[in-house]
Amino acid sequence: MQAIIKEFQLGQHTVTLETGAIARQADGAVLASIGDTSVLVTVVGKREAQPGQDFFPLTVNYQERMYAAGRIPGGFLKREGRPNDGETLIARLIDRPIRPLFPSGFVNEVQVIATVVSVNPEIQPDMVALIGTSAALAISGIPFSGPIGATRVGYIDGEYVLNPTLKELEESKLDLVVAGTDNAVLMVESEADVLAEDIMLGAVVYGHEQAQAIITAIKEFKAEAGKPTWDWTAPAKNVSLEEKVASIAADKVGEAYRITDKVARKEALGVAKDEVVAVLTSELAEGESLDKQEIGKIFGSLEKKIVRGRIAAGEKRIDGREPDMIRALDVMTGVLPRTHGSAIFTRGETQALVTATLGTERDSQLIDDLTGTHKNHFMLNYNFPPFCVGETGFVGSPKRREIGHGNLAKRGIAAVMPTLTEFPYSIRVVSEITESNGSSSMASVCGTSLALMNAGVPIKASVAGIAMGLVKEDDKFVVLSDILGDEDHLGDMDFKVAGTAGGITALQMDIKIEGITQEIMQIALKQAKAARLHILEVMDKAISAPSEELSQFAPRIYTMKIPQKKIAEVIGKGGATIRQLTEETGTTIEIGDDGTIKIAATDGESAANAISRIEQLTAELEVGTIYEGKVVRIVDFGAFVNILPGKDGLVHISQISTERVNNVTDHLSEGQEVKVKVLEVDRQGRVRLSIKEAMESAAPAADAPTDA
């Protein structure tokens, strides 16, 4: 069993690719490693396509094994279950740059499985998985126009940093992933701390340049370990049928694409397609049948040719707009009375209903992954129900696309969010897409910014998002602002940019063709900035600053600090004291290890009551001070008196009266209120009290000290 190993340097790290020792029955299997982070990537393809298959069934699975970090999974089963959101996002990150590189017409099933088997917490496994996938596909023999290289780029102290560690990313103003071939960028995914367009473009170019070392190494690895390429040829085009379909439907498709309303346009295209089927069916000889899937594919190609040709020739777009025009905008805030914050953002035929909900730290999301357990205080969920595109469909748990779009919107907003210290709330945003015709994720960014401001969340600035498209025919190209769903489907690029008036906060790019130059990206960024500023201007007319008051239905959070040694007194035995406090005051109380207490209440009176009770619980008794107390228990040698919540002291029989006391019950009864003087608090916290000295003392009774 002879393993083939390839090592190469990538920035500060050494990358190792190994094949031939593990998973030898897969078409391609590579153990990719950077430092102690290792990912096993396998690729298997079916030699024969399913009969009637009309799409490319590529599946990418990314899975993190807890043993990779020396941990045992939680839960009853103690094993990994369905992919979490993080795993789903990385699976999409791998899928996006490799999918365009399979040849047109290739519809054989291909499955990529990336399994994290060892992890160094400082080296993220996503880049290792991407590099491993590229290498595994390259050596598999499956038709693939790779390899690709992928890098992560940070921006620290004005310098680009290649593949920064997790610690370096904490200081970085940028987290950008770029993937591409030796001569083209295919995919960009990023989050930024309000950076200028030229810095973002520079990061893309830098990352692509650095990825060349990966591509070169994988080519050398393939030369040594690669399997013969499959003997596959693309199915021959049915030219005569294409010409026949065009002769029947070209004019009607052209007319349909001059209809600006999406629903009406869809109906017109349906009529044209039905006519094609009817005409061709009438011309069939006896015993012949019509391949409706093939007809549908040819009809789709005709649509694409007509729309792209018009745009490239300088004609107006499908809905009558110029290339840089934005659809009509409509913005409303505070639309739902009981939510903490809400907004409806409408751009043409795309609409998002967005809500913001405030909660306590206890409401934050607990994430258990390879790096350990940590809390997520800002959650953004994106829902794309079938009715938003006028269809019926399955409604249930979120699909990969919904998870990805929600994450993109969240990354676009993250840079302007307050810290937990500045605003001690957990925040959940939900974007319900109620209409969709292109760029619903960017509508979610705009709606989120509006809903957060409506909720009174002190975000640093308004954020807007825009989706750009591209039509490139030979040397001609047109960059489109605010693309429709059809333009996304028929175009060559999906380029999404979110940001404030001051710069970019998120950038996502997916390119379907090679040849996207730096010039094209520069024009797209410039056009996107103009569009973003226009949208921000409209949004600011609706709401330009966070509401000064929170919703009356939102919890108010008050913060106080107690000495760490007093934490146990507030919690009580088995949590009894804090449970009693929350029940009696109607508040939610959270205590940090450093003694910070957060009290959440829907009204100020409840919070003030809870604060007062906690101050009493944590107050230090002062020797010589007189307190008002209540007798709670009588014993033969005296009585126990409660002087502060949770604090009892003993009045010895000799300290009850100036007269001789033979029987305690002759002078005191349970529930009786008395004034007592603190004589002593010993090392164990036991308190000696005196009624006699309180009566003799001339000092006035003191209220409970509020030393907290």
From Swiss-Prot:
First-listed, main subcellular location of the protein, grouped into a coarse class: cytoplasm
Keyword flag Thylakoid: no
Residue positions binding Mg(2+): 488, 494
Domain S1 motif: 624-692
Keywords: Cytoplasm, Magnesium, Metal-binding, Nucleotidyltransferase, RNA-binding, Transferase
Quaternary data: Component of the RNA degradosome, which is a multiprotein complex involved in RNA processing and mRNA degradation.
Name of the protein: Polyribonucleotide nucleotidyltransferase
Organism: Pseudoalteromonas translucida (strain TAC 125)
Lineage, broadest ranks: Bacteria, Pseudomonadati, Pseudomonadota, Gammaproteobacteria, Alteromonadales
